[in-house]
Amino acid sequence: MSETKITYDDFNPHAFETLDITDETKGAREVIRWAYDVYGDSIIYSCSFGAEGMILIDLISSVKKDAEIVFLDTNLHFQETYDLIDRVKARYPELNIKLKQPSLTLEEQADQVAPALWKQDPNQCCYIRKIKPLEEVLSGATAWVSGLRREQSPSRQATNFINKDERFKSVKVCPLIHWTWDDVWDYIKAHDLHYNELHDFNFPSIGCIPCTEAVSGNGDSRAGRWTNSTKTECGLHTTNKP
């Protein structure tokens, strides 16, 4: 694997096409090691603290113990998510875990934009509470890590290990692209990792309270998000603006 730094302006889409993905982590450990060796302090992991996030935190901490981990705190998350963050902080005390707040409180958003904006215009709500905060976080970074997997949804099937991120004009590193949902849980159980307790109650994907529901039956691992809506992404991984 090349030690050359890949940037947004000097992007090489073919850098990892020959990577061996037959190891336990399907290439994830090697991609993470490369990313932190090359980018150092100029790479940030934006973590939602979902199941995939627990794996990435575990792998990242083995490479860079003081890595910067940012949680986009919309002020609309489940208490179980905040409890998980506290448990993760206790297990990995050297990690630099930060909670990034939006510029508007929920009360200010209701007054200045609309009450319960997530009902009237969920794209705008995600833009204010997630996309803009991440833009601020990444303003000084060259690259960021994401837990996207190809299996998660049709919109994510073309994701590569290294991606030119047009939304944030950055490089997006996605170490888990080849993992299945079973792979995720096999690793969590094998390494006795913490995870959000809502996963035990039929929540495969966990976001903000108003936009997340438990699911019944089989579906992709994004099921339960924005139910009865055509919306499938918060916007962090698309180039469309609200």
From Swiss-Prot:
Catalytic residue positions: 234
GO biological process: hydrogen sulfide biosynthetic process; sulfate assimilation, phosphoadenylyl sulfate reduction by phosphoadenylyl-sulfate reductase (thioredoxin)
The protein's enzyme class: oxidoreductase
Coiled-coil intervals, chain numbering: none
Record-level GO cellular component terms: cytoplasm
Major subcellular site: cytoplasm
Cofactor: [4Fe-4S] cluster
Pathways involved: Sulfur metabolism; hydrogen sulfide biosynthesis; sulfite from sulfate
Cofactor stoichiometry and binding remark: Binds 1 [4Fe-4S] cluster per subunit.
InterPro entries: PAPS/APS_Rdtase (IPR004511), PAPS_reduct_dom (IPR002500), Rossmann-like_a/b/a_fold (IPR014729)
GO MF, one example: 4 iron, 4 sulfur cluster binding
Listed Gene3D superfamilies: HUPs
Record localization: Cytoplasm
Catalytic activity: [thioredoxin]-disulfide + sulfite + AMP + 2 H(+) = adenosine 5'-phosphosulfate + [thioredoxin]-dithiol
Similarity annotation: Belongs to the PAPS reductase family. CysH subfamily.
Free-text function comment from the UniProt entry: Catalyzes the formation of sulfite from adenosine 5'-phosphosulfate (APS) using thioredoxin as an electron donor.
Protein name per Swiss-Prot or TrEMBL: Adenosine 5'-phosphosulfate reductase
Gene: cysH
